[in-house]
Amino acid sequence: MDGYWAKKVLHVGDAKCVPCWNGGGTVKVIVLSDEKGVPSEETLQAVRDYIEENRPVGAKVTVVGATPIPVTIEVSIVMATGFGFSEAKESIGQYIREYLDNIAFQDNTPLSYYKIGERIFSAPGVQDIDTYTINGEKLSISAEVGEFFQLQEVIINETL
């Protein structure tokens, strides 16, 4: 369900509504910031105020911030000639963040193990991938409604 009213508030990137989350007449609005992260308390209060002014009579609305799922990527790569370690690490991090931003708050869209591999392999400075994990596993990760993936760290090991 779309968080139409919440999206009208400054610094809101996306929002989801969960009807009847706590019984009849209740609605939970889950907010993602415009930077694809946890919104500030000021933003959440602005959403509450805006919805309170516009909501239907009788609806009890709860506004909360989205919940991050921390993501750590560890990868062993063969670096391309002419690239430094820090360049490769930065480009891999950027490519992964772009992917996570694209899937943030999309219903039924897991963090795909194979799409992370594509992003790593496509990053400037990477000639080949030896192995990689997401949070220590070689598996895709699912998110529940109101959750989003947040990159914590990219750990790179160079393979010769």
Question: Where do the model's predicted regions map?
Answer:
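An aromatic-glycine-centered, glycine-rich loop/turn in mixed alpha/beta architecture
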Residues: 88-160
